[in-house]
Regions:
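Soluble non-cytosolic domains of exported or imported proteins
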Residues: 2-6, 24, 75-83, 95-102
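Feature representing long, continuous alpha-helical segments
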Residues: 6, 10, 38, 42-46, ...
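C-terminal amphipathic alpha-helical "assembly" element
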Residues: 9-20, 150
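Hydrophobic, well-ordered secondary-structure elements that form the walls
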Residues: 12, 33, 92, 100, ...
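Periplasmic binding protein-like
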Residues: 15-68, 103
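Short, solvent-exposed loop/beta-turn-alpha elements that line the ligand-binding surface or hinge
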Residues: 32-39, 60-90, 121-154
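Bilobed periplasmic-binding protein-like "clamshell/Venus-flytrap" ligand-binding domains
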Residues: 41-46, 95-130
Length: 154
């Protein structure tokens, strides 16, 4: 985080905000802000559920459906945009193919226009392997490697 702190500060100040950092451990941050609407103006915190995969429904629900973030931390639950996102998530869960993707895109649009929680970094997960020595190895879309059913020529 320290490497990007100046860039975040500069961007927020360019938007007209006065920035004062009060850096804390995650557990301290959450115990301070949970349920206290006046505890902060902006919180920048790490979190990356993409380690569980790239399923759009899982990732959207992680942040925007459960009470921990929507009610205790963002104080967004119950607002019209919250209800709209929940409706879109339910419709997307029932849909398939392009119709499902279109509903997820609509959900992201509502989130980006209304919700006070939005990612500022997006992770890329590289995987490197030697295809000559690992038989039947396939990269996976999450952090880590899976060697189930894989053999080696060495």
């Amino acid at each position: 985080f320290s490497a990007v702190r100046p860039m975040i500060k500069e961007s927020l100040e360019a938007a007209g905000l006065t920035v004062q950092y009060d850096e804390k451990a995650s557990s301290d941050v959450y115990s301070t802000i949970d349920g206290n609407v006046d505890a902060f103006d902006i919180v920048i915190a790490p979190g990356d559920p993409s380690v569980f995969g790239d399923d759009a429904d899982l990732l959207l629900r992680w942040w925007y459906a459960g009470d921990t973030w929507t009610n205790s931390r963002m104080h967004w639950k119950g607002q019209d945009s919250y209800n709209q996102v929940q409706d879109l998530l339910e419709k997307a869960q029932q849909a398939t193919g392009q119709a499902q993707k279109d509903l997820w895109h609509q959900t992201f649009d509502v989130i980006s226009e209304n919700v006070p929680l939005y990612p500022i970094f997006h992770r890329k997960t590289p995987t490197a392997y030697d295809g000559e020595t690992l038989v039947d190895f396939k990269p996976i879309a999450v952090t880590g490697l899976s060697f189930v059913g894989v053999g080696s020529t060495k």
